[in-house]
């Protein structure tokens, strides 16, 4: 079955949905490479304390914060990353029990640690100019959703580039 790409282009922002896709390291990196992101917030859900992923985050010396609650074996992790660091850690994310992760490009990197506790909807954050892109990957759902600011990205070109990536693939 071929991946399905849907796009909804609005005045100030766009939503792009990619379904029926294998969320492999290669696929995710190819999509990430469509954007010029220097550093970004990487939010990973449902990380276990004993997981290799958590150990690697600490080993790679990445700046991170958690939603750690004493009694829960699972927590969310937000960390500041760049593409090279992401390429090192993506294998551990895909192999972990994490169900979803998101890549968020924020204008004000000083406040990145607050992102984990910020429950404002992504669309509102884009409209307010706080973030310019959010790429959410549902590992178990085999889906990727991208919300982006039209003032910064050419959404029609991004959709064309995504369709070109998957034109001859069966996932």
Regions found by a protein language model. Name each.
Residues 1-171:
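Structured alpha/beta or helical-core interaction and ligand-binding surfaces enriched in interleaved
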């Amino acid at each position: 079955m071929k991946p399905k790409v849907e796009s909804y282009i609005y005045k100030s922002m766009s939503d792009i949905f990619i379904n029926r896709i294998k969320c492999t390291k290669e696929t995710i990196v190819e999509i990430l490479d469509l954007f010029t992101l220097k550093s970004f917030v990487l939010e990973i859900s449902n990380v276990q304390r004993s997981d290799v992923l958590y150990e690697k985050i600490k080993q790679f010396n990445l700046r991170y914060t958690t939603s750690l609650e004493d009694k829960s074996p699972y927590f969310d992790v937000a960390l500041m990353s760049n593409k090279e660091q992401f390429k090192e850690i993506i294998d551990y994310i895909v192999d972990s029990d994490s169900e979803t992760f998101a890549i968020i490009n924020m204008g004000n990197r000083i406040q990145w640690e607050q992102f984990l506790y910020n429950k404002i909807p992504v669309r509102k954050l884009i409209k307010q100019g706080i973030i310019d892109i959010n790429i959410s990957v549902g590992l178990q759902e085999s889906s990727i959703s991208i919300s982006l600011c039209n003032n910064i990205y050419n959404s029609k070109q991004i959709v064309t580039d995504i369709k070109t990536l998957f034109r001859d693939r069966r996932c």
